[in-house]
């Protein structure tokens, strides 16, 4: 029996809906208008309502929104819509996915598997990659997530802007704005956001043949010989010099060294930020590391007794504090709804949008708004309109 999964990726593209089962239903009767922060939102027509599996529901609505702001482009970068007129309704194309908090259903932050870095891919490619790497799980739906280095100008190109934790793998422990975590615990506390994201020092995890962690050890320093009883990490890392990408190459000493030359994934983010996982390929050899490769050099007798060729190891900074119970964490933007009310808008321009929120019972709400296509009645939203939308669909908090 296949399990069910709701998946998030970090690419900024349109919502992908998989498995549509029921024809559209048109709404009749009194119009329900949701208002907050000077913005208003209502559904003009329900185009589709699709009941997926495990209580997951997708709806596509033709909607209208307004704001008490004025003067900015009504269609964002599509100037054909003129400027926003305060309190005038503009048409919107909205997709909403509701995911009940329950066992057997997960929200996963997934990036394309790349041993040495980050790779551009479509949502469909990401969904296929997830299923390939996680046999038995089925992707039901996918939605865009965090922003990322879309032009590939960073030292390690195409990284996400914020935190990336995927099924407990802390791929990128660097926060930007908001950080959104998913507990996947089946309770009303399905989402953690608006907290201080924290990680501990780098840690080495040693796995047994069943993929279970049997021991963990602190990493004391980087790219230098360890003192007695200590363990250090060696890795080559990229950096920018006057906009030019360069690498600081490291050479592993032969004594007390255990090197992974074919990592499952090796992400060198800076001189003191690294994630790596893979089986030990070489023991006790001097070697110049290429980007993504890494080595453990240790004078800890307990650790040395566990390390050998083909032993699976992982280097990461474990999540601590408020997000410690979240197995999937993603970077986000601002707070839209807090304690059931619209909250502090800061962006007063219309764009295509992606949102996530939580209902009081733990149900997660994912929403997208199309934009920059005035001729198709897709104007996009500014933040106060987004808040009205998320309140309309029952969220007590949203981001």
Regions found by a protein language model. Name each.
Residues 100, 183, 283, 297-299, ...:
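A structural detector for beta-sheet-dominated domains
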Residues 8, 108-125, 371-388:
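A short, flexible low-complexity segment enriched in Lys/Arg and Gly/Pro that occurs
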Residues 299-399:
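Extended C-terminal subregions enriched in glycine
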Residues 282-284, 292-298, 307:
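Acidic, glycine-rich loop-and-beta core segments that form the ion-binding/anion-interacting portion
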Residues 1-5:
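N-terminal secretory signal peptides that target proteins for export/translocation
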Residues 25-276, 281-291:
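Zymogen propeptides
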